[in-house]
């Protein structure tokens, strides 16, 4: 199934930190986004629709592992050794793009006592939706992008919440909003609105990228955040 990280991650509050208009293909803009910042189910649905609409899904070999890749100088081709289940295969390609999606696999830390812990334990990328956190004492290890999203979602229902972090990140309120049916209908009828908004968002993010390369330029933002 297509989706990558948006297929694997289903924790409470899972979504994108980039506005939906930009976090989509320029050749496949959508008027279906319910919020300015899309949620995980919507992004997964969008990726599935795009893969089907453009005939990509039928070309994907799911469950296939790339075991070896070697460049054949004589033929100017890549020789790819693959494995699907117990069946091995070989393919030739002019171009190879490594898009292995490393963040689709949960990275479990090596912590003392982890193996002997008797309570419920799971990674945010392998969220146990059958386990009710209501009234529980919960410890969250790490404050990456996932924790920033799910901690506010579970905090109101748990009895105690302890968050352990190595480095505290700066977190600003997300300027999200419900787009509503009227906005979606308007975008569908006048695609130029979304295209213009997409360009505006891209420009603003490019300004932020400049600030990341030149930290002094972000000092006003840092001051406002404090």
Where are these regions (language model features)?
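Rossmann-like dinucleotide-binding core of oxidoreductases
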Residues: 1, 91, 98-226
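Feature captures the FAD/FMN-dependent oxidoreductase FAD-binding
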Residues: 35-104
């Amino acid at each position: 199934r297509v989706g990558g990280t948006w297929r694997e991650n289903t924790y409470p509050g899972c979504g994108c930190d980039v506005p939906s208009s930009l976090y989509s293909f320029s050749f496949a803009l959508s008027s279906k986004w319910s919020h300015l910042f899309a949620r995980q189910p919507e992004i997964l649905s969008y990726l599935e629709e795009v893969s089907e609409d453009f005939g990509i899904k039928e070309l994907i070999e799911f469950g296939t592992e790339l075991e070896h890749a070697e460049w054949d100088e004589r033929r100017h081709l890549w020789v790819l050794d693959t494995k699907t289940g117990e069946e091995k295969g070989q393919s030739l390609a002019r171009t190879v793009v490594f898009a292995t999606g490393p963040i689709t696999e949960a990275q479990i830390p090596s912590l003392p006592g982890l193996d002997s812990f008797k309570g419920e334990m799971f990674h945010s990328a392998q969220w146990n939706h059958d386990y009710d956190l209501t009234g529980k004492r919960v410890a969250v290890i790490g404050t990456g992008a996932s924790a920033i999203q799910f901690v506010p979602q579970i905090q109101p229902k748990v009895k105690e919440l302890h968050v352990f972090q190595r480095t505290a990140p700066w977190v600003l309120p997300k300027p999200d909003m419900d787009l509503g049916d009227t906005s979606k209908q308007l975008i569908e009828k006048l695609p130029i609105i979304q295209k213009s908004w997409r360009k505006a968002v891209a420009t603003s993010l490019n300004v932020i990228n400049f600030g990341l390369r030149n930290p002094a330029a972000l000092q006003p933002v840092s001051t406002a955040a404090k």
